[in-house]
């Protein structure tokens, strides 16, 4: 099992790394004194037991007919999920500003500049060619969110929700948010648990946020949210795996792309092309931020026989799917797309249910990969 400080991570980032907290379990007898412990190392016995559990729940695979159904009707399963839970399943992700300082006001470019300086690289301008320019999923946040209370009476949004982005005339001069000086895209935005905290926290008039999701129901919930402001945000339905559909922005126009527990939801064979397409949207010096499930996370170990689709890829009871990554797999995906590693680390967290005296070991992977600056060969 990889440690909390993976090999190959920039030393300067490892030295500064405080994001995941500093509550370490040094005395096992105190495990139930807090709700969570950070950077928990696994014993060899624990790692071996996790591997055996995965082998056991992977023996019996879902039949091919059902696998085809889960792929063809993936949008239906996600729409059903959001119709049931609406905006009450996940908490707003205010932790993002700690884990990803690039998203915090006035720090988005400074943090990136620091990294380039520390790595003796030229500092990117992060501007365009003009003058400025899911214990079912995630962390089982079954809490309502005040910021996600949507209007009960709104105009129909079906036309806006289902608009075909491929029909838009995308050019470098005019597109949604074309006058912005800093552009962020979240892929797999759900009901806005990342987007709205960003918009609420950052009042920079030059900021524009794009957000898309596979589920038209999720996008409708975003667009009917009282916090949704079309002058600062553009929400649209998009299939990450559809090579025929374009994004509503030109290539080389985005500063940040966010992937939070979304890449794991698609078929592994389609991941590389999806990342390749997203990479082309980044400006030179732009950053891709990811947080997703790691191999042997508690959610993976809880799957039963008959839920495995392929190696480390499973289907939940509601028909949605999830993959569990290794650091090496994610590094290959990003570097093959032409991005450079800034951060790739494992967050091993021990969550505790003090009432039931239960311990739950979570494994997540967090990545930051940067698009290289333009060179003479590009």
Curated annotation (Swiss-Prot):
<feature type="binding site">
    <location>
        <position position="239"/>
    </location>
    <ligand>
        <name>S-adenosyl-L-methionine</name>
    </ligand>
</feature>
<comment type="subunit">
    <text>Monomer. Interacts with DALRD3.</text>
</comment>
<dbReference type="GO" id="GO:0052735">
    <property type="term" value="F:tRNA (cytidine-3-)-methyltransferase activity"/>
</dbReference>
<feature type="modified residue" description="Phosphoserine">
    <location>
        <position position="4"/>
    </location>
</feature>
<dbReference type="GO" id="GO:0006399">
    <property type="term" value="P:tRNA metabolic process"/>
</dbReference>
<dbReference type="GO" id="GO:0006400">
    <property type="term" value="P:tRNA modification"/>
</dbReference>
<keyword id="KW-0597">Phosphoprotein</keyword>
<dbReference type="InterPro" id="IPR013217">
    <property type="entry name" value="Methyltransf_12"/>
</dbReference>
<feature type="binding site">
    <location>
        <position position="188"/>
    </location>
    <ligand>
        <name>S-adenosyl-L-methionine</name>
    </ligand>
</feature>
<dbReference type="GO" id="GO:0030488">
    <property type="term" value="P:tRNA methylation"/>
</dbReference>
<dbReference type="InterPro" id="IPR029063">
    <property type="entry name" value="SAM-dependent_MTases_sf"/>
</dbReference>
<dbReference type="InterPro" id="IPR026113">
    <property type="entry name" value="METTL2/6/8-like"/>
</dbReference>
<keyword id="KW-0007">Acetylation</keyword>
<keyword id="KW-0949">S-adenosyl-L-methionine</keyword>
<comment type="function">
    <text>S-adenosyl-L-methionine-dependent methyltransferase that mediates N(3)-methylcytidine modification of residue 32 of the tRNA anticodon loop of tRNA(Thr)(UGU) and tRNA(Arg)(CCU). N(3)-methylcytidine methylation by METTL2A requires the N6-threonylcarbamoylation of tRNA (t6A37) by the EKC/KEOPS complex as prerequisite.</text>
</comment>
<feature type="modified residue" description="N-acetylalanine">
    <location>
        <position position="2"/>
    </location>
</feature>
<protein>
    <recommendedName>
        <fullName>tRNA N(3)-cytidine methyltransferase METTL2A</fullName>
        <ecNumber>2.1.1.-</ecNumber>
    </recommendedName>
</protein>
<feature type="binding site">
    <location>
        <position position="260"/>
    </location>
    <ligand>
        <name>S-adenosyl-L-methionine</name>
    </ligand>
</feature>
<dbReference type="GO" id="GO:0005737">
    <property type="term" value="C:cytoplasm"/>
</dbReference>
<feature type="modified residue" description="Phosphothreonine">
    <location>
        <position position="154"/>
    </location>
</feature>
<feature type="binding site">
    <location>
        <position position="78"/>
    </location>
    <ligand>
        <name>S-adenosyl-L-methionine</name>
    </ligand>
</feature>
<comment type="similarity">
    <text>Belongs to the methyltransferase superfamily. METL family.</text>
</comment>
<feature type="binding site">
    <location>
        <position position="82"/>
    </location>
    <ligand>
        <name>S-adenosyl-L-methionine</name>
    </ligand>
</feature>
<keyword id="KW-0819">tRNA processing</keyword>
<feature type="binding site">
    <location>
        <position position="240"/>
    </location>
    <ligand>
        <name>S-adenosyl-L-methionine</name>
    </ligand>
</feature>
<dbReference type="Pfam" id="PF08242">
    <property type="entry name" value="Methyltransf_12"/>
</dbReference>
<keyword id="KW-0963">Cytoplasm</keyword>
<feature type="binding site">
    <location>
        <position position="213"/>
    </location>
    <ligand>
        <name>S-adenosyl-L-methionine</name>
    </ligand>
</feature>
<keyword id="KW-0489">Methyltransferase</keyword>
<keyword id="KW-0808">Transferase</keyword>
